[in-house]
């Protein structure tokens, strides 16, 4: 069966499963080394001085952005993490003093006491991506809705974080899908 015989949602689900399977097959040691290497590429991001960067708390076998976030903090950027809220994600400040609460899915989020921030740069987890900047998330639409809301109040740089093995030759884009501005993998940063 060709992809032209199925809906974009079905294609995305197949690609999501394939990419997540590839990611799950990576060794534990490789995942650690790849996550650490993100910080080695921090200067390739070329972020404006003092911008606010939203990261994420990794779940399952996602690439771990915490070494990168620490490198960004050392460069003077304010950090925040997403919190699932209605009608879309909000972002709370992340500092060394931040208290965390369980946020479901095995992840942590800053407590409600943390200041809510509007990020300039959104570092996003993903299941799969292609060379045009299209991404497949986990199917809940949290980031799509957050991006749409954040773009109402100004520019937003959307950067995916992933392992190279999550790249696919072609990811279908639907009208609600916003392409990423760049991708950072263990091999470095690519701007789309």
What is the role of each PLM region?
Residues 139:
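Short polar/charged helix/loop
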Residues 109-110, 125-128:
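A structured binding-face within diverse protein domains that lines the active/interaction site
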Residues 58-61, 127-131:
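Short glycine-rich anion-binding loops that position phosphate/pyrophosphate groups of nucleotides
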Residues 1-10, 14, 21-24, 113, ...:
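Surface-exposed, charge/polar-rich loops and edge strands
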Residues 2-117:
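N-terminal active-site beta-alpha-beta segment that forms phosphate/nucleotide-binding
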Residues 87-93, 134-136, 158:
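Short, well-ordered strand-loop elements centered on a beta-strand within folded domains, enriched
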Residues 64, 87, 142-143, 167:
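Short phosphate-engaging motifs
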């Amino acid at each position: 069966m060709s992809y032209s015989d199925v809906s974009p949602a079905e294609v995305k689900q197949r690609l999501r499963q394939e990419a997540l399977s590839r990611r799950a097959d990576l060794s534990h040691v490789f995942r650690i080394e790849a996550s650490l290497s993100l910080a080695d590429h921090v200067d390739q991001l070329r972020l404006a001085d003092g911008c606010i960067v939203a990261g994420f708390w990794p779940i399952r076998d996602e690439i771990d952005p915490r070494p990168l976030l620490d490198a960004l903090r050392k460069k003077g950027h304010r950090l925040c993490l997403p919190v699932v809220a209605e009608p879309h994600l909000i972002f709370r400040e992340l500092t060394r003093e931040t208290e965390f609460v369980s946020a479901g899915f095995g992840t942590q989020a800053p407590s409600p006491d943390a200041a809510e921030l509007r990020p300039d740069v959104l570092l996003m987890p993903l299941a799969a991506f292609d060379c045009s900047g299209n991404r497949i998330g986990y199917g809940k639409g949290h980031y799509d809705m957050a991006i749409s809301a954040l773009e109402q109040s100004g520019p937003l740089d959307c950067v995916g974080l992933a392992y190279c093995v999550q790249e696919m030759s072609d990811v279908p884009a639907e009208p609600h899908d916003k392409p990423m501005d760049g991708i950072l993998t263990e091999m470095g940063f690519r701007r789309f």
